[in-house]
Design a protein with these regions (language model features):
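Conserved short histidine dyad/triad with adjacent acidic residue
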Residues: 24, 39-55, 89
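A generic "binding-loop/recognition-motif" signal
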Residues: 56-57, 75, 91-92, 101, ...
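Short, charged/polar surface micro-motifs in flexible loops or helix N-caps
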Residues: 32-35, 45-48, 67, 111-113
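Short, conserved beta-strand element in jelly-roll/cupin
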Residues: 41-45, 55-70
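Short acidic-glycine-tyrosine-enriched beta hairpin
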Residues: 75-89
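Short beta-strand His + acidic residue motifs that chelate non-heme Fe in jelly-roll/DSBH
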Residues: 50-52, 70-71, 87, 93-100
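A short hydrophobic beta-strand segment most commonly corresponding to one strand
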Residues: 42, 60, 86, 101-113
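A short, N-terminal "cap"/entry segment at the start of jelly-roll beta-barrel domains
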Residues: 1-36
């Protein structure tokens, strides 16, 4: 059994800036996972944005706290705690924190990359 906490050294050592706006860490990745690409947590400060980008895998953004404006291709929607957004392979997507507190999301990616 593998259990990771967001404050574990193995997680903190993976900290990176994701697409220009979010501070992200890999909770689990391909070093462990076989059928899933990764599970990451990302924090967007108010006014920050995960800039529009296209990935070669499908993803799910799940909002834990805060809120933001989620864009997938030509659709835009306000998202908040408990919302899960499916992002198909090859879709242009972005998330802007338009609230007044951090927007914290879990990102699950397929293994297609």
């Amino acid at each position: 059994m593998i259990v990771r906490h967001v404050n574990d050294k193995e997680v903190l050592d993976t900290t990176y800036l994701a697409h220009g706006g979010a501070i992200a860490q890999m909770i689990l990745d391909r070093r462990i996972l076989k059928e899933i690409g990764f599970l990451a947590i990302a924090r967007l400060a108010p006014g920050k944005e995960i800039e529009g980008h296209i990935d070669p895998m499908e993803e799910i953004y799940f909002v834990l706290s805060g809120s933001g404006e989620m864009r997938v291709d030509d659709e835009t929607r306000q998202v908040g705690p408990g919302d899960a957004t499916w992002i198909p392979v090859g879709s242009l997507h972005a998330l802007k924190n338009n609230g007044d507190e951090d927007c914290v999301i879990l990102v699950v990616a397929s293994s297609n990359w």
